[in-house]
């Protein structure tokens, strides 16, 4: 790969979001184009099909917001399922909890994991060698369909934006299957897109989860390299869902190890739903 510094951009609806840097890896897998760059400001970053997935500088905005509201709010968290998550960041955050005994990480594209292990070592960290983590190169939808009833305490949907091979992860049918394999007091956590750049998808996810699950709540925060900068995560349960009061005696220790997440941050983020989204959900 030539040592050339240039602008690498993601294009969305007449807008572009770019980082200046050098391309370290450009590879086409069976599913998508994988691009790793070394950027001037955000460090190493991952693109899939020319969409930003993560960067060294801002990845904790995403991973900490996806994981900790869920795991801090449930008592039982021994069995965890991650759909996607090939950069290793979600697994890393989950493994901070001593109660976690087993994580199944189901990633459809093995090349994403290989690229992340080679170029984004700091994101996955020691998660890749933790014996509690088992990696499965498989289709997440099919994995969920085959899983036992009431098996997982927490399911994380850490996937890319809807595409030819990920569209089924955003359907009522898939959410119903996730509900089936969750324990009664378990929780589902999913990235739920941007209320600005991907408003229609965002609304669809929120409405689908409200339809399928008894309870669901959405929080908003920032992921600087994502289109518009504002992002969301939605949490759903078929039983209890108390996201304001932690059920975990490790919270204080975990807060100290986080760059972004703490309970005050979380509680404020759950109150940030834009009014235009409120009106659409109530229409």
Swiss-Prot record:
Name of the molecule in the record: Polyamine aminopropyltransferase
Alphabetized GO MF terms: spermidine synthase activity
Active-site residues, as the UniProt record annotates them: 158 (proton acceptor)
Entry's family note: Belongs to the spermidine/spermine synthase family.
UniProt keywords, alphabetically: Cytoplasm, Polyamine biosynthesis, Spermidine biosynthesis, Transferase
Complexes and interactors: Homodimer or homotetramer.
Presence of the UniProt keyword Cytoplasm in the record: yes
Pathway annotation: Amine and polyamine biosynthesis; spermidine biosynthesis; spermidine from putrescine: step 1/1
A GO cellular-component term linked to this record: cytoplasm
